Amino acid sequence: MITRRDCCVLAASALAGGMALGAASVAPTAPGASEQQVQSGRLERWSAFPSQFVPARPVEVWLPPSYDGRRPHAVLYMHDGQMLFDPRSTWNGQAWCVDQIAAPMIAAGQLRDFIVVGIWNRPEHRHAEFFPKAYADALPDSPVTQHYRAERLKSEVLSDAYLRFIVEELKPAVDARCATERGRDATFLMGSSMGGMISIYGLCEYPQVFGAAAALSTHWIGGHERNAEIPAAALAYLRRKLPPPGQCRLYMDRGTVELDALYDQAQAQVDALMVELGHKPPRVLSRVFEGQGHNERAWSSRLAQPLRFLLEPRA
């Protein structure tokens, strides 16, 4: 069990009656026995972070062992927060084990000081919150898209609302209560699968807030079969909205088995678009990991690489 001392005091406001964030606050609780625990650093938890835009959900903030509340830290916002730290608490017995990978890298000087904000998904809303609304608005009416809307989205597309929750409610609360660097050069997004899609979308929609993103195993196809419609909508959007070269950084990758085996064509199209638009290494990277699949164990095994990309110490 991690001892909680000298933790930053986090707060979220009661939003009942339209009350603005900051009007009232509640301290987070320590994780219970059935919730995520960490082996390195400290974890603080809002059991239900309130929002005017999306349903309330748990949010956890990981503080590295060196965090003392005085030195400003970069902030990495990660999606699917319930899968980030503790395999004993997840539905599939796997986790990213972010604390175990990041803490020794920070201690060794391989990464700048940073904290992680793990945003839990709401399973019933995950596709609706992570599928970019701009993609959805551009989809043609076809059997593929009709099936996707009926079977996956199931409701109105909530990704714009989800990003507003992060930018307008969650980030101000974290910045107010933790020692953070608040500029875009220290504020990043990371996710896998659908979380990769929303991370890239967030980078494009809020370039003044997020300076870089990492998208692992990006689920460009939307469903479980290759299709042309959803990748085409993504490409058209990226052509319009991706920040100009030199004004953003983006890490992408994929494996070659399981669902990741279906991403080769779409990811190749995205890679070609990046080159066409003038985005080149080292500011934009796309990597392939042979033999790796679509699961937390795979993402954990290569997590050090996107962490270095996002958080390499400043010269």
Outline where the language-model segments fall.
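Non-catalytic cap/lid and distal C-terminal segments of serine-dependent acyl enzymes
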Residues: 30-315
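N-terminal export signals
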Residues: 6-27
